[in-house]
Each structure stands twice: as structure tokens, then as C-alpha cells.
Amino acid sequence: MKKIILTGGGSAGHVTPNLALIPKLKELGYEIQYIGTESGIEREIIENEKIKYHVISSGKLRRYFDIKNFTDPFKVIKGIFQAIFIMRKEKPNVVFSKGGFVSVPVVFAAYINGIPVIAHESDITPGLANRLSSPYCTKVCVTFPESVKSIKGDNAVLTGTPIRQELLDGSRIIGRRMCGFQNDKPVLLIIGGSLGSKFINNTVRNCLNELLKIYNIIHICGKGNLEEKLTERNGYVQFEYVSEEMPHIMNAADIVISRAGANVIFELLALKKPNLLIPLSRKSSRGDQILNAASFEKSGYSMVLKEEDMTPKLLLDKLKKLDMSKHTYINKMKASAVQDATNKIINLIEKYK
């Protein structure tokens, strides 16, 4: 039987594209296994899929000073040896890496064992993990045309980001019913990323009274960020994190406020959802979300609001403008040529079976 090992973790963005590939890989007869960390978000997500999960040690790749920067390299080295053992025991035909710090030991181990590695980079510029790993990859799938030049050599392949079929099959009716909405107001979905965004959460809650005059609101606010005093507010539903229900939640939305991680913005594109993107600022990130948002704004898929400019008043103004021009955005998204990433990646994997 053909065997593939998937890896990627640290945030949901390093896991969900793997989920999009799993049903097709199963159809093609692959035995699928996964390598991740013991406590990462990837573990619960993957184990819910009933896929064999291997735990390895991994350090975090930081761009700032931290005392752990001196100890984490030893965790990475330990992770490489653990991954080498897994590779030699399981003997996969190919490894697919979605990035994140856990992927680095896995890619190195596969390379040492002569196992082909296909990596995927969602953002315009590669993250630190993929920059370290890409020289050891057979091919690197990229999402944006601008990304091809960021990968050294000629092993970059433009595929786009795979979208889970169940996301496309979600039900607007079920999503609204899940949230208990009792009126026909349009639904505003707020996504702060899998780890949440206190900045977005606070700004939204500071203008909640005005927003609720216009919208029913679904607010995915991140773990530990629920506001207890708002749990009984009519028309306002909070979730720390959404997994299985996400297809219905996304399809229930009429307008979306979101961070600008590549996975979520391509999901919004696939679903043709008018959206206001609030990318992470350069103070909090390497600036990849700013580039992602700029690309989507240029293509006419998204309206953008800089985090440093964001106030309750400006947020309300932007949403009003977005609502007035939503059909223009929808038509632009309908004309997009970026699609079918799942099959493109699967076809690439099949070359190395």
C-alpha cells in the first residue's frame, strides 16, 4: 500500500490544508500518518480524523530574543532523530509538509532517508520554517504567483491553497440555526485567527451596539477570549474556536471580518464572501499577512483596514462601504482563476508514489 506522512503545526493554518488533501488521498488508497507535537493544535484536529499520529520534540522558531532560543535547538535535534526513526520504521513513499516549526525536523529526516518531500507555502513570502526546509524539498507548492521567485532553484510549483470540500458543502440554513438567530438581518462573521485577536475582539465589542442594529454577529474570538457578560446578548454568538461546525458557520455569513492568513482568505475567495481584512501588523508578525491582504485588495477580492488605523468608528465606516459595494467584490471573486489546488497537489504527490 502507498504510504504518505503529513506534517505541519503550531496554528490551524498549518493543519487545515492537510485536511483538504486527506479524503482524496484515502480515495487513492494511501495509508496516511501524521507527525506533530505533543501539545500542538494539530494533535486534536488530526486525531479526530482517526489518523495515526506520531509525536516528536520541536522547538519554536523565534525572531526575537528569548532564553529558550538557547535550549530549543536541542529540541529540534532531538526531533530530527525521532523523525529519522519514524521514517525508517514506516518507510513512507512521500512526505507532505505544510510548514510550522514541527515540520523542520520531519523534512530533514525525510531528506536524510532519501524520501521525496513536497512542501506547501501559503503566504506570499515563505515562513521561517519553510525557508529552512525548502532546500531539502523535492517540490514547494506556492499559493500566489508572486511567491514563485521567493523559492530558490526551480522547484516551486504554483498550485494555490487546497480547500476542504466540506467547507464548500456547508449549509447557510444550518449555520443560522446553530446560532439561534431569530430574524433576517445579514450575518457578520468575525474571525480573529485560530489563536484569536484581542485587538479585533476589543474593537468589535466597543462598537457592538451599533453593529447589532445592522447584523447578527458570529464572533470567533479565540481560546480564553469569551466575554461572559455578553453571552446572553441577542444576535451575538461567541465561539472560542470552531472546527466541525465551520463549514456551516462560513456559509451562514454575508460579510466577514478576518485576519489575512492565506488559508482563510482563500476560503473566503472560494465561498465568494465579501470581506474586510485586518492583517497582523509588522509589530506582531513578519508582515506576511500585510502582503497577502495587499494582493487580494489589488485583485479586487477584499477591502483592507490596517490594524494600527483601526478604531470602532473606522471599522463601522469600512463595513458600510463594503456592504454598499459587496456585489462588485463578489463578481471579482467569481472571475478568479485560482482554483482546483487540491487536485494539483494530489497530482504532484502521485508522481512520487
Curated annotation (Swiss-Prot):
The keyword Transferase applies. Keywords: Cell cycle, Cell division, Cell membrane, Cell shape, Cell wall biogenesis/degradation, Glycosyltransferase, Membrane, Peptidoglycan synthesis, Transferase. Its EC number is 2.4.1.227. It catalyses: di-trans,octa-cis-undecaprenyl diphospho-N-acetyl-alpha-D-muramoyl-L-alanyl-D-glutamyl-meso-2,6-diaminopimeloyl-D-alanyl-D-alanine + UDP-N-acetyl-alpha-D-glucosamine = di-trans,octa-cis-undecaprenyl diphospho-[N-acetyl-alpha-D-glucosaminyl-(1->4)]-N-acetyl-alpha-D-muramoyl-L-alanyl-D-glutamyl-meso-2,6-diaminopimeloyl-D-alanyl-D-alanine + UDP + H(+). It is found in: Cell membrane. UDP-N-acetyl-alpha-D-glucosamine binds at residues 11-13, 164, 194, 289. It is a peripheral membrane protein. GO terms for biological process: carbohydrate metabolic process; cell division; cell wall organization; lipid glycosylation; peptidoglycan biosynthetic process; regulation of cell shape. GO terms for cellular component: plasma membrane. GO terms for molecular function: UDP-N-acetyl-D-glucosamine:N-acetylmuramoyl-L-alanyl-D-glutamyl-meso-2,6-diaminopimelyl-D-alanyl-D-alanine-diphosphoundecaprenol 4-beta-N-acetylglucosaminlytransferase activity; undecaprenyldiphospho-muramoylpentapeptide beta-N-acetylglucosaminyltransferase activity. It comes from the Bacteria. Transmembrane segments: none annotated. The keyword Glycosyltransferase applies. Pathway: Cell wall biogenesis; peptidoglycan biosynthesis. PANTHER family: UDP-N-ACETYLGLUCOSAMINE--N-ACETYLMURAMYL-(PENTAPEPTIDE) PYROPHOSPHORYL-UNDECAPRENOL N-ACETYLGLUCOSAMINE TRANSFERASE, UDP-N-ACETYLGLUCOSAMINE--N-ACETYLMURAMYL-(PENTAPEPTIDE) PYROPHOSPHORYL-UNDECAPRENOL N-ACETYLGLUCOSAMINE TRANSFERASE 1. Belongs to the glycosyltransferase 28 family. MurG subfamily. Cell wall formation. Catalyzes the transfer of a GlcNAc subunit on undecaprenyl-pyrophosphoryl-MurNAc-pentapeptide (lipid intermediate I) to form undecaprenyl-pyrophosphoryl-MurNAc-(pentapeptide)GlcNAc (lipid intermediate II). This is UDP-N-acetylglucosamine--N-acetylmuramyl-(pentapeptide) pyrophosphoryl-undecaprenol N-acetylglucosamine transferase. It comes from Clostridium kluyveri (strain ATCC 8527 / DSM 555 / NBRC 12016 / NCIMB 10680 / K1).
